[in-house]
Amino acid sequence: IIGNLVSKGLPSGRANIAVTIDSKVLQYSFSSAAKTTVKLETDEKWNDRHFIYIPPREMFSLFEGFIGLSSKREISFDQTYINLAHALALPVLRESEDNPLRPAVELLERELQFKVLQMNGRFYIQTESGNMEAHLVAEGLRKLASILYLILNGEINANTILFWDEPEANLNPA
């Protein structure tokens, strides 16, 4: 129930959220009694923006078969995980010299010392030693690999607004 996010001690009993980026305003609100509905007030200028949400639990190791399972069965994952699985399902874009995020990809691959591959619906981490299944890699590295793959497949681009819940979780220093 979305209303549980509203502090019960607020005099109005409403949550009001406003985001302004590049003179584009997005506002929404909901009451402490709301179950699933929010009141959305937005500029049409937001229609050209793409949003992606990275939930606290990583999706990389759960990916294989997740979309099929979630479409046919009730599962205990909310829609944000299903949306992320659909975003991860897309293949990588053709390599382009004019991609503004190319330097970010190169930096991530250099610092992480791996590349990310998807083969037959399963993710792999490719190092100099070979390919390793994603579920065998530390959770923090899987989160970073997800971000890297979302850049490679175009789901994160120069116009994407990234919401990353608990980005610091499991990103322990080596």
Segments predicted by a language model, with ranges:
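Conserved D-loop-proximal element of ABC-family nucleotide-binding domains
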Residues: 172-173
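Walker B catalytic acidic pair
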Residues: 165-167
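Phosphate-coordinating catalytic segments in nucleotide- and nucleic-acid-processing enzymes
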Residues: 1-159
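Walker B motif beta-strand of ABC-family P-loop ATPases
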Residues: 161-163
